[in-house]
């Protein structure tokens, strides 16, 4: 395997030479440079969470995520890296040595390792290629009470309902077509994590959830206890949509999507702390504002167009605030906004 030296954040590390392989997917060890933002944001989150943490990344690839955690967050006490590929394991060891980082490296099936680590991890980060569904039960079993579960899903087309049968088979949910389909996909993922957590007697409290062009990501505090798990399930429901109107309902019909997480997607205080490090601050400030709005959907400007024309997003937000409606832009759509109001209230103000 031909290697080159790469740099991400504060870490130098070896990766398979991209000039040697047709794509990152054909390389013997997987490294996705487009996930750098994901890893950087995860480092910021860990900085706010604690210190001396036992962190497990069961799908490590080159090991860059775990190594960045160890070097940049100052929060890691024990680092556990794993990959089912022997070539990946050798590369992980090489990268740990290059950076002077101590870590335990395993060559196991991810689920097997997570079962062996039962109740020992403060942080479990599931970052697969594709769906995280096959790993979540074992991830919760490895987690300690009040641990942090982090989950990435790159099967976004499935989560937003583009492939209905696969969505139902994989996530046991039904997603209808709506203008706010990105938020439905994100809430679909968080809802699935919550249901798996409850089956393992955990509740979840999302602290940081978002969408990027090719993936969904959620990180949540997990609290052990049957009663807590039952309470967590109260945050599940269905979102009904018809002719621009939206509402939360408790049953599935031809106009509703779910089951979905209808509670908060994140903690504004946590994201505010993350934004203080000066990295991706504008993005994090947008999330902070979004998390403060309870409505589990967003609106898009074309929904309020008259004769094919609608005001700019900035003007729309200004008009709504003047009308006494709390509203903010969303990171999930370039022409979208979230508001503590229904469609008719917004349309009335914009038509004045």
UniProtKB/Swiss-Prot annotation:
Signal peptide: none annotated. SUPFAM superfamilies: S-adenosyl-L-methionine-dependent methyltransferases (SSF53335). The keyword Methyltransferase applies. Its EC number is 2.1.1.216. Residues 4-350 form the Trm1 methyltransferase domain. CDD domains: AdoMet_MTases. GO terms for molecular function: tRNA (guanine(26)-N2)-dimethyltransferase activity; tRNA binding. Dimethylates a single guanine residue at position 26 of a number of tRNAs using S-adenosyl-L-methionine as donor of the methyl groups. This is tRNA (guanine(26)-N(2))-dimethyltransferase. It comes from Pyrobaculum islandicum (strain DSM 4184 / JCM 9189 / GEO3). The gene is trm1.
